Swiss-Prot record:
Molecular-function GO term, any one: DNA-binding transcription factor activity
Region ranges (Disordered): 1-24, 62-97, 260-303
Domain bZIP per the UniProt entry, residue ranges: 132-195
Basic motif, as annotated region: 134-155
Record's protein name: Transcription factor RF2b
Pfam families referenced in this protein's UniProt entry, alphabetically: bZIP_1
Amino acid sequence: MQEPKHTDPAAMRGAHHRRARSEVAFRLPDDLDLGGGGAGAFDEIGSEDDLFSTFMDIEKISSGPAAAGGSDRDRAAETSSPPRPKHRHSSSVDGSGFFAAARKDAAASLAEVMEAKKAMTPEQLSELAAIDPKRAKRILANRQSAARSKERKARYITELERKVQTLQTEATTLSAQLTLFQRDTTGLSAENAELKIRLQAMEQQAQLRDALNDALKQELERLKLATGEMTNSNETYSMGLQHVPYNTPFFPLAQHNAARQNGGTQLPPQFQPPRPNVPNHMLSHPNGLQDIMQQDPLGRLQGLDISKGPLVVKSESSSISASESSSTF
């Protein structure tokens, strides 16, 4: 790289050209070797934070001499020439050009520094430490920071791999548990369905039992009603029989009349016809049958069987024969 020619400071102050000083400020030493990089260039770059800090340092270094030179030139111009009105547009243009040039120079210097860091070997670094110790220390610090960042990245990757393995193991265990839970859920659902079916069957049985109980109750009520009607009919029939008087047959009255006509002759007990339960007051009155006929000529004598005439005749003949035999004796 060729050195720029030194010009007269008075001419530079008259032209107000500031870029010449800025270029001189970024001049690198001649003994610095900027050859091609060797192996491990990426190891010397460092992290993004290191690069940013390096860029800020270079920008401060580049802006310091330029600002100092600019202020000296302004002071010299103010003292040498009388004050004159300034054109604002021209000054703004000059300022914008200065900042643009400063940014370009800073970018170029950063690129040169990166190339220098890539190309640095231990021998060159030792030579640089002898020439510029601060820069060598900064390069060493960047290398150490890069090594630490690599170590952190390696530890982080190892930790991530360990976590991935742990998560895979947990996922396998959880999948097995999920399979068991699904199997249990299937069994429980089948058992639940069976219990529902049994519950429906029990409900149907309960409904049938209720219907059967209702039918039995209805049948019982019907039987009670039927039994009550029969009991009422029997009671009415028995009460009717109690009110109906017993009709004395005709043949005991005839026999009694015959006995009175024969003078009170009595037959032995074996020849006497059987007598029903006849009241004594009816037997004592010979005209009882006629009184009964007069009291109820139709109703109560309808049950008498008048066709039993031979029995009456037989009893009379037996009584007559008995009276004849008694008279013969």
